Swiss-Prot record:
Cellular localization per UniProt: Cytoplasm
Gene: clpP
Subunit structure and binding partners: Fourteen ClpP subunits assemble into 2 heptameric rings which stack back to back to give a disk-like structure with a central cavity, resembling the structure of eukaryotic proteasomes.
Record's protein name: ATP-dependent Clp protease proteolytic subunit
Signal peptide: none
GO BP, sorted A to Z: protein quality control for misfolded or incompletely synthesized proteins
Active site: 107 (nucleophile), 132
Cellular component GO terms held in the UniProt record: cytoplasm; endopeptidase Clp complex
Organism: Methylobacterium nodulans (strain LMG 21967 / CNCM I-2342 / ORS 2060)
One Pfam family this sequence matches: CLP_protease
Reaction(s) catalysed by this chain's protein: Hydrolysis of proteins to small peptides in the presence of ATP and magnesium. alpha-casein is the usual test substrate. In the absence of ATP, only oligopeptides shorter than five residues are hydrolyzed (such as succinyl-Leu-Tyr-|-NHMec, and Leu-Tyr-Leu-|-Tyr-Trp, in which cleavage of the -Tyr-|-Leu- and -Tyr-|-Trp bonds also occurs)
Keyword entries, A-Z: Cytoplasm, Hydrolase, Protease, Serine protease
Amino acid sequence: MRDPVEFYNSALVPMVVEQSSRGERAFDIYSRLLRERIIFLTGPVEDYSASLIVAQLLFLEAENPKKEISFYINSPGGVVTSGLSIYDTMQFIRCPVATLCVGQAASMGSLLLAAGEPGHRFALPNARIMVHQPSGGFQGQATDILIHAREIEALKRRLNEIYVKHTGRDYDTIELGLERDNFMTADAAREWGLIDEVLQKRAEASPAA
């Protein structure tokens, strides 16, 4: 059964009607923006939303492997493995991916923000960015709990290494910074190396990014 909140939210997605020589055609707003090579991540990162993002990235690469993709992020984070599937696809495809935080980029959202093309990672002035270490819970036999604890520790190390790669900070600094929930303004995120620039106004020569 479909989640009633999801159904309600989907019913609120605006439609865009375009006129052409072949008549009218209606698109939901996100599909229309996809034609402009704009992808949105809104809400939690989980398997379904990650699959949609990955599919859009692969589609846009197939259309034009050299043209930039604009990836807008407003997310509280979510499932680590789902986020890593998006991250790996961003690094895998040939298109440069510009990232822009609107609202918030927390947890896995901040990692995806930092993973954009160097020099093309942005946030709007009132965006909030948050980094922290992965969390999880497990119940079961003591041996299984230890197995899951080792897995979370391995994920923590891997996420730290990714932040090191994209921020230019050393591992110890990253590990300390992610020890607890670490909230930042857009300017602080720039100083931290998560983004390259805080955008006040869109450049006239840049219609999408």
